[in-house]
Structures are given as structure tokens and as C-alpha cells.
Amino acid sequence: MKKSIKERVTMLAMMAAMCVTFTACGGDSDDDGTPQVPTGPTGSTEYVDPCLDFGSSQSHVKEYMSGFNWELNENSNEYTLLYSNAGASVVINYMFIGNGKGLGMVGVTYASGGDSKALGFKAEIEKRYGITMKKVTNSEDGTEYIYEGLATIGGKQVEIIMNCYKQGINIIYALPD
């Protein structure tokens, strides 16, 4: 049975909450030997480049991750790859969903949040993918909000959802249903 994007996002958020001590990462777009990219006006916010080769196999994602200082978590399985680093400040879940079990969703959870960090990440995503992310929801007390946008990544339409809250930020990249 095919899961809707909301069901997959909910499942990913629950996994991230359970795995908050694990982290993962992706590329090195600024070629400085680290996968984090300084963003924001102070350059102190670090955006992580995950592998976004949708449809690819677990072995491809493992190869992509092998060039960096991230460890594959023992709780990884045929549906999910989890990586960790020493800082445990970021969690990345690579999810392989569907019959072919190719990469279908990537979730990046940052253990710290705040408006300036969220706005830095939003600006970085908009710049990278040439999109404008729209604010779609806000909590009653104004401490939690969601931005979303649709981008073309590797020739595929990808939905990007960024959930921002006081304690952290979740960025989800998923193929639409």
C-alpha cells in the first residue's frame, strides 16, 4: 500500500524524534572538506547537504556518505539508513519506500532551532533550488511554523517541507505521491 506524503512525513518525524542522538549528512557543495555549508548573515548556521539522488539504491547512498566523517547506525535496515557523527546535532534519515525500495524520502533534523537559523536554511534552500518557499502554517503561540516548496532536483519534482520550532528544525525532501 502506497503511503501518502503526510503519512511518510509523520513516520519520518517519529523516527527522527526517536533517533535524536544520531546524525548523518551528505555532500560538500562548497568543497571545504565538510558537508556543512555556512548560511545566514553571520555564517554561523550550518546547512547539511544530504544525498538527494532519488530512486537510488542503499549502496549508492552508502558510497555517497563514505567520504565524510559519519558512521552508519546499527539500527539501519532495508527501509532506512541512519548515520551519526560525534556531535549528534543533526539526524538524517534516508528512507527507501515502495516496491523498488529506491530512495524516496530524506529527512534532516537539526537539534537546535530558532528564527535566524530557520530563515538561513530557508534562504539557502531557495537559492539552491531557485524556488520560493511558502509559509503554510503557524502554531497558535507563534513558536512553530512550516514552509513548503516544490523543486526540481536531479530532474525529479521534489517536495520540500521545513518544520521550524523552538528546539529544532526538520527539513523533509520527498517525491510527491
Task: Locate predicted features.
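Bacterial N-terminal signal peptides that target proteins for export
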Residues: K2-L12
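C-terminal motif of bacterial Sec signal peptides marking the signal peptidase cleavage site
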Residues: V20-A24
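Bacterial signal peptide processing site
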Residues: G26-S29
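N-terminal low-complexity, Pro/Thr/Ser-rich intrinsically disordered segments
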Residues: D32-F54
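Amphipathic N-proximal alpha-helical interface segments
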Residues: D32-P38, N69-G120, E140-D177
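Amphipathic alpha-helical segments
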Residues: L52-E71, S116-K134
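Solvent-exposed serine/threonine-rich low-complexity stretches and specific carbohydrate-binding patches
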Residues: V136-N138
